[in-house]
């Protein structure tokens, strides 16, 4: 049997990030063959990940990737078991790598990387979801990760002129839009983007609430309720967090100030755990 040295174990740990005893056992099992030991560890990692795959992953982070030209942003929700691991540097690096990989290819197969990281960190890790937004015209992708990386936001904002994107009012607008989405949690960009079945259900609820009113008054009351509903769930209809006017009116005011057209085209908001069932 080949003698396993401390130097070999240290080198294998550096290459794989696996634990000391795991590296020693891998080298022993493969008689000092480093490549075979790496493969042995990968197989062990996969087995370890399988054992841990049923553990609850209620913690985690939202990771962000923005391309160098600022034209494509990607959000990823990655869940783990404990907040301690969510704050771990190795886990954070892993999350950033996953976000970059999904930016390149939204359908990327990252299972091997996930199982290897499960073995290294010692907790169940799940790549829960990812989404990207991009622009192929003048404008910018606004991004924001809230403190603790529990909420992440993307928004695409189009302009008529490229030079608008370099102005301070526009940059401030991007920041304000992401803060609005973070704080107010809109469900849709505008009225056209709302789920029409859900909208009709809101109308039915309102009609039931006021069924004892005169018939001619019911529809006016219902439409008033729906207008209020729009102001709560549609981003452009929401009250802007920094003023009394709506988000739509605030964007229009900035556009007028800059002599350009500015339009919010789409947004994504991820919050850790919001897709998990109780």
Question: What feature does the model see in each segment?
Answer:
Residues 2-278:
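N-terminal assembly/interaction segments in proteins that build large macromolecular machines
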